Regions:
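Short hydrophobic, aromatic-rich alpha-helical segments embedded in or entering the lipid bilayer
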Residues: 52-57, 210-220, 274-277, 449-461
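Membrane-cytosol interface at the C-terminal ends of specific transmembrane alpha-helices
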Residues: 133-195, 199-202, 375-439, 486-489
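N-terminal, non-cleaved signal-anchor transmembrane helix
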Residues: 1-84, 88-96, 100, 105, ...
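A structural signal for multi-pass alpha-helical bundles of membrane permease subunits
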Residues: 35-48, 123-130, 194-197, 270-273, ...
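Cytoplasmic-entry segments and transmembrane alpha-helices of multi-pass inner-membrane transporters
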Residues: 93-124, 151-155, 332-368, 394, ...
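Hydrophobic positions within alpha-helical transmembrane segments of bacterial inner-membrane proteins
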Residues: 83, 87-95, 99, 119, ...
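Generic hydrophobic transmembrane alpha-helix motif, especially the helices
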Residues: 113-144, 354-385
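Hydrophobic alpha-helical transmembrane segments of polytopic membrane proteins
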Residues: 213-249, 454-490
């Protein structure tokens, strides 16, 4: 919704309908699509006694118990080492790619590598390097390099051109360093810090497929019903991420990275014959390997009917439902985190809850919910909506704090509905569309937990050593994600959606 005029501020009048048409229509269609998807979704509660399991989890949360200190320190060290090394490689590669981001082929390459989830990359590299440090490093570095290249490239493009023109006689590299890079540096550092937090969460999730991070011990404790130990590890994870502002210092980063390289060298026992066979034979469709081109059509048709189409459909269904409930929860949670609506104590409590929800990865939340309700789309919907709505609600609350209100502005629900929401609705949609791509990626990967999205069929293909099927399904997942990214950018452009707020 567009910003209300200065005359209407404080009057609690509904803005004119003409300014709302396109945004209302977009919101309505997304809600309608989510409603249709709900009719197709499997949201059955399969667990025979979820309340008993919930009670056991609650008891574990209030009586945390640590695993052995050796396991805890090992998990922490590996988690930090994977994140630091992966981000170091991603920053260097992302920066180099950002310098060439104006070229379409660079943008396409970056879009492709970031469209593949880090867990899918890990499953690929496990076949090549086993459960080694190199697998974890590459699984983090590749998709994050694509993401950082995009953001860095856009930051460089958005810097004012006047300073660069003023240095026409300077060398190109010098001009870039003293203009574009210098102007973009604060935002670049801020975003890199945020991505490191994301890398910590991703590294934890790599433990769920066997790498020795905190997630490995957390998955073991949850699977065996040791909820007190799981709670202890959960609190360590929350403390690790929440305390970043104190221990993540620029001056200490070289020291951290050096220690990470010593503790966990990025090595692997590489069998070059196996590696060559994987990329030159194993991922090639079986009919083509057998020089049987006539059977390629039936092979592809079978894969489409049995795995590709059901996987794509369920991924789309899950992501659209999760997107809708993300929007709904974000709009409901935002007022409880904004000083325009609540007192300081309520705001602090709300901030704490949102911090927990956005700190815990969707995969972990879905895993816990799956233990309660069984393998349906319901755990995934709840996990995706909780995590992403917490991120959006926190940002919307920050936007609302910059708004100026008249002394006679209305209060309560009217203030929210007619004063604040119309002025931040464009920003809300912008954030929602940014998260759409993330939700799509996560919807695919949650199939590893038993939900019939693309991740379910990809994981099954790896377990059956059908790497050709896995490669094609991963390619489909990447293309689906790239299509959603293009659609989201198109909608943002056509609706003139921005992330700056009218503070008048």
């Amino acid at each position: 919704m567009p910003a209300v005029s200065a005359h209407s501020l404080g009057q609690c009048k509904k803005p004119g309908a003409s300014g709302f048409v396109s945004l209302r229509a977009t919101s309505f269609y997304f809600a309608l699509i989510a409603g249709v998807c709900l009719l197709l979704a499997d949201i059955e509660v399969i667990s025979p006694n979820p309340w008993l399991e919930l009670k056991a989890m609650g008891q574990g949360l209030v009586s945390p118990r640590m695993v052995s200190y050796a396991e805890l320190l090992n998990g922490l060290a590996n988690t930090l080492s994977f994140a630091l090394q992966g981000m170091a490689v991603a920053v260097v590669a992302g920066f180099a790619l950002a310098l060439l981001y104006r070229h379409w082929w660079v943008r396409s390459f970056c879009a492709f590598i970031r469209a593949i989830h880090e867990l899918f990359w890990a499953l690929i590299f496990i076949q090549c390097f086993g459960l080694s440090p190199l697998t974890g490093l590459l699984a983090i570095a590749l998709p994050y390099a694509g993401t950082l290249a995009k953001i860095y490239g856009e930051l460089f493009e958005e810097t004012p051109a006047q300073p660069r023109r003023a240095l026409q006689e300077a060398r190109s590299l010098s001009a870039f360093c003293y203009t574009s890079l210098a102007l973009a540096w604060p935002a670049l550092c801020h975003y890199t810090r945020y991505r490191f937090e994301c890398a910590l969460r991703s590294t934890v999730i790599l433990g769920f497929i066997g790498l020795p991070t905190l997630g490995f011990y957390l998955e073991t404790a949850l699977s065996e019903g040791h909820y007190s130990e799981a709670a202890g590890l959960l609190y360590v994870l929350l403390l690790l991420i929440a305390s970043q502002r104190w221990w993540l210092r620029k001056s200490l980063l070289p020291v951290y990275l050096l220690v990470a390289l010593v503790c966990l060298p990025p090595s692997a026992n590489v069998n070059w014959q196996t590696l060559t066979q994987f990329f030159t034979q194993d991922i090639i469709p079986q009919p083509l390997r057998a020089n049987s081109g006539n059977s390629f059509g039936p092979w592809l048709a079978f894969l489409w009917q049995q795995q590709l189409w059901p996987g794509v459909l369920n991924t789309l269904v899950l992501s659209q439902i999760a997107l809708f409930f993300t929007a709904l929860l974000a709009l409901l949670a935002m007022p409880f985190n904004a000083p325009l609506f609540v007192g300081p104590w309520v705001q602090r409590a709300s901030t704490g809850l949102l911090l927990v929800a956005r700190t815990l990865p969707e995969y972990l939340l879905a895993f816990v919910a799956l233990l309660l309700w069984g393998p349906s789309m319901l755990p995934a919907i709840v996990a995706l909506a909780l995590h992403n709505s917490a991120i959006i609600a926190q940002l919307l609350a920050g936007f609302s704090e910059s708004l100026k209100l008249r002394d006679d502005a209305c209060k309560g629900v009217n203030r929210y509905a007619y004063e604040i929401l119309p002025r931040i609705y464009r920003q809300f949609l912008a954030l929602l569309f940014y998260r759409w791509e993330v939700i799509m990626r996560e919807s695919a990967i949650l199939g590893i937990l038993g939900i019939a999205t693309l991740g379910f069929y990809i994981d099954s293909a790896f377990e059956e050593f059908r790497f050709d099927r896995a490669a094609l399904l991963i390619l489909a997942s990447a293309l689906l994600n790239m299509a959603v990214d293009i659609l989201a950018r198109t909608l943002r452009r056509r609706l003139h959606i921005v992330t700056t707020v009218d503070t008048r």
